């Protein structure tokens, strides 16, 4: 059976916070596709972007991009106050430098609220995604601690996953590890809600893979000694 759809990267959706998100505008695009008798919404890779901000170069094959988390949905869940929401911005080209500087400030506030009283949904998410989440969160925490240095520039004991070095890093960076886990919970909560809405309206999401994921990602640290 023939079917058609539209390619629309999440970051290209209009939105008030400098980039397209998984919020109202994404749901409205699903409505548009359904009204236009389309079947597919094709997107680009949705992982956390690395150097150059290309969706095809990600820090993880499994994690979601924190830039796509919708602040308004976090506020609706009681994780942000209205006063903590950034001022709306004019729709225009994405300023990734501004996102890099400003988004973590807001996400930390939401994460702190969640982690102060973890929900059963959060705990279930962490358990279900334990195969990649813990390693990813530790990788990102160490990377932040080391000024975003690439894996090749890490100390040998961390790069080769020496148990003592990993244990020390987990203890030293426990708060940041929890932050990165919470952010992934935010992303996947919103992503799953959007996907369910799209599917219920006869729209299938077609993704892509980050083909430029090389040394600066979390997964090689799990099994490969470089």
Question: What are these model-derived regions, one by one?
Answer:
Residues 4-8, 41-42, 205-207:
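Hydrophobic faces of well-ordered beta-strands that scaffold small-molecule active sites
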Residues 25-46:
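Catalytic domains of carbohydrate-active enzymes, especially glycoside hydrolases
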Residues 46-77:
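Aromatic-lined substrate-binding rim segments of carbohydrate-active enzymes
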Residues 67, 76-180:
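Extended, charge-enriched "interface" segments that sit outside catalytic cores
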């Amino acid at each position: 059976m023939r079917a058609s759809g539209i390619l629309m990267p999440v970051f290209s959706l209009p939105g008030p916070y400098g980039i397209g998100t998984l919020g109202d505008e994404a749901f409205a695009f699903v409505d548009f596709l359904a009204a236009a008798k389309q079947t597919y919404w094709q997107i680009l890779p949705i992982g956390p972007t690395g150097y150059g901000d290309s969706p095809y170069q990600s820090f993880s094959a499994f994690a979601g991009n924190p830039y796509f988390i919708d602040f308004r949905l976090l506020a609706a869940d009681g994780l942000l106050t209205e006063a903590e929401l950034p001022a709306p911005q004019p729709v225009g080209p994405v300023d990734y430098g501004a996102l890099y500087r400003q988004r973590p400030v807001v996400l930390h506030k939401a994460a702190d609220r969640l982690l102060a009283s973890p929900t059963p949904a959060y705990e279930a998410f962490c358990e279900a995604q334990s195969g990649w989440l813990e390693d990813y969160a530790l990788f990102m925490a160490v990377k932040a601690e080391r000024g975003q240095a690439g894996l090749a520039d890490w100390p040998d004991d961390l790069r080769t996953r020496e148990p003592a070095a990993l244990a020390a890093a987990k203890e030293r960076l426990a708060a940041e590890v929890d932050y990165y886990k919470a952010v992934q919970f935010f992303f996947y909560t919103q992503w799953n809600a959007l996907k369910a809405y799209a599917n219920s309206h006869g729209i299938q999401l077609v993704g892509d893979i980050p083909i430029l994921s090389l040394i600066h990602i979390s997964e090689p640290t799990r099994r490969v000694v470089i």
